[in-house]
Amino acid sequence: EMTSSLVGSEMCIRDSRKKVAKRRLNMQWFKIPEKIYFEPGSVQYLAKMPDMHRVMIVADPGMLQFGYVDRVTYQLNKNANQPSIEIFSEVEPDPDLTTVRKGVEVMNSFQPDVIVALGGGSAMDAAKAMWLFYENPDADFVGMAQKFMDIRKRIYKFPKMGKKAKMVSIPTTSGTGSEVTSFAVISDKSKNMKYPLADYELTPDIAIVDPEFVYTVPKGSTAFTGLDVLTHAIEAYVSILANDYTDALALHAIKLVFKYLPKSYATADKEAREKMHNASCIAGMAFSNAFLGVNHSLAHKLGGEFHIPHGLANAYLLPHVIEYNGQPTPTKLAAWPKYDHYICLLYTSPSPRDSTSS
C-alpha cells in the first residue's frame, strides 16, 4: 500500500509495505558416524580396529560388575596393536559435571587415542563430554549449553574434535540413540538442572550396535527406554526441520517399536531385542538431524527437578504433547497434518484433532 502527504510544496511518498529480511538458509545435510556395526557379535570390530594404542573405557559401575567391560577388553586384547587399557567406571545416572571433570583428569593422565563409551545414555553422554574437554581444555561449558533453534546457526561454535582420540560408542540399552547423535545431556545436580549439549562435533566416530549387550536388560528398563525410542521417532517425524531422509528413518523406527517392544518387554525375545536395538539407533539418526520438540524439553526439566527416569518422563508427557500438537492452531500448522495422516489409518475421526486425540 502506497500513501502520500504534502509537506511544504513537496510530495512525500511513503511505502507502508512490510519489509522482510531475506532468510539465510544452510544447505540441507544428514550427518551420522563414519561407521555403524549392527549385528550380534559386532563388538568383535574392536579386535580389528586400526590405529589404537591407548584405549580408555568409560562406563557405569554395573558394566564392570556384570562383565560387560570384560567383553570389550577381551576384544581389545585380541587387537594386533595390543593397546594399553584404562577403565573409568564411575558414571552415574544423569551424569554430573563433577563426574565429567573427574573423567577428564583420568584422560589427561592416561592420554588415550581411542575412547570407548560403554553403557546407556548416561555413559555415552558422559564420555562425549569428557572427550570434548580432553581435546579442548579451554572449552566454555556455559557457551556450549546456550539455547538455540538451529544447531547450525547459533553464535557459539564448538571446537573441532578428533585431534587426540576417536570415539567408539557401544550402547547397552535400546533407548537414547546417543551412539549416533550429536547430543550429550549433562546435569548440574547442585542446581537441579540438565544441560543438553548439541553439536555435530559430538557425534561418535564409530557405533557398535550389538544386540548381545541388551538380551538381559530388565523389563522396567526395556519399557522406559523403548518409549524413549518412540518419542524420539515421533518428535523427529513432526519436527519443522524434518526432511525426506529423517522421515524415512523416523517412520520405520515407529513401526519397529509398535511391532517389537511388547514382545521385547514381555518375553525378552532375542529377535525383538535386536529389532528394538536397531530401532533405537535408527531413531537416533533421525532426531540427530531433524531434532526434537517440546516433549523432550519438558522431560529434561522433569528429570532435572524430580530425577524421574528419562523414558518414563517422556511416556508421561507424550499423549498430552501429541494432543497439543494435534490442534490445528496457527502456531502449530507444521505438526498436526503429519500426525493425522498416519493416525487416521488407525482411527476414523471427523477432524485431525479428534483422530490425534484418539
What residue spans do the PLM features occupy?
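Gly/Pro-rich interdomain helix-loop hinge
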Residues: 305-349, 353
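Carboxylate- and glycine-rich phosphate/diphosphate-binding segment that chelates Mg2+/Mn2+
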Residues: 180-290
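Single conserved hydrophobic/aromatic residue that forms the stacking wall/gate
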Residues: 1-15, 347-358
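Predominant activation on well-ordered alpha-helical scaffold segments within soluble catalytic domains
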Residues: 47, 73, 86, 101-104, ...
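Glycine/threonine-rich beta-strand-loop-alpha-helix active-site module
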Residues: 98-105, 109-209
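Glycine-rich phosphate/pyrophosphate-binding beta-alpha loops
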Residues: 175, 285-294, 299-308
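ATP/NTP phosphate-donor binding region
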Residues: 20, 25-114
